[in-house]
């Protein structure tokens, strides 16, 4: 991000930009998102968008980072709540969680996956990888002490 929002109003503007971007990705596809479209969907002027982000790629990267962090945390929470569950059932549950996540956010994650080659080295990919590693280590330690 170009400028980190400090005040509540600025944080709300950034959140509106990110929500507008998510809507654009779901509606137009990530390759057809433009800053004017983000402006229209978010209700934030193009000039204000550029106060916080250098370009649309940076907006998408920030959105994907936040969504990836939330997704990873949700998976960890889901797995850790399964105290008396067989590992096979946790695997099935985790796969179902993954497919449900793909369908959530009006196709946002499906659109990102279609273009994963552009994001596979992103900070968001590293965040997901770290969460998956932590889940795997937790399960390994629990079932194979």
Regions found by a protein language model. Give the residues of each.
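Amphipathic alpha-helical linker/stalk segments
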Residues: 63-90
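Short hydrophobic clusters on alpha-helical segments that form packing/core surfaces
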Residues: 17-25, 67, 71, 98
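Helix-turn-helix
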Residues: 12, 16, 24-58, 62
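N-terminal intrinsically disordered/low-complexity leader segments
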Residues: 1-12
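Amphipathic alpha-helical packing segments from all-alpha helical-bundle domains
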Residues: 69, 73, 89-96, 100-104, ...
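Charged, amphipathic alpha-helical coiled-coil/dimerization segments
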Residues: 80, 104-110
């Amino acid at each position: 991000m170009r400028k980190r929002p400090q005040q509540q109003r600025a944080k709300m503007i950034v959140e509106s930009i990110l929500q507008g971007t998510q809507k654009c990705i779901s509606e137009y596809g990530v390759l057809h998102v433009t800053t004017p479209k983000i402006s229209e969907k978010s209700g934030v002027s193009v000039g204000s968008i550029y106060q916080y982000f250098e370009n649309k790629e940076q907006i998408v990267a920030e959105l994907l980072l936040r969504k990836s962090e939330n997704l990873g945390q949700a998976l960890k929470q889901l797995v850790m709540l399964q105290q008396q569950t067989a590992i096979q059932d946790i695997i099935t549950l985790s796969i179902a969680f993954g497919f449900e996540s793909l369908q959530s956010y009006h196709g946002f994650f499906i659109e990102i996956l279609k273009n994963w080659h552009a994001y596979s080295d992103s900070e968001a990919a590293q965040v997901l990888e770290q969460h998956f590693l932590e889940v795997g280590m937790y399960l390994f330690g629990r079932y194979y002490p």
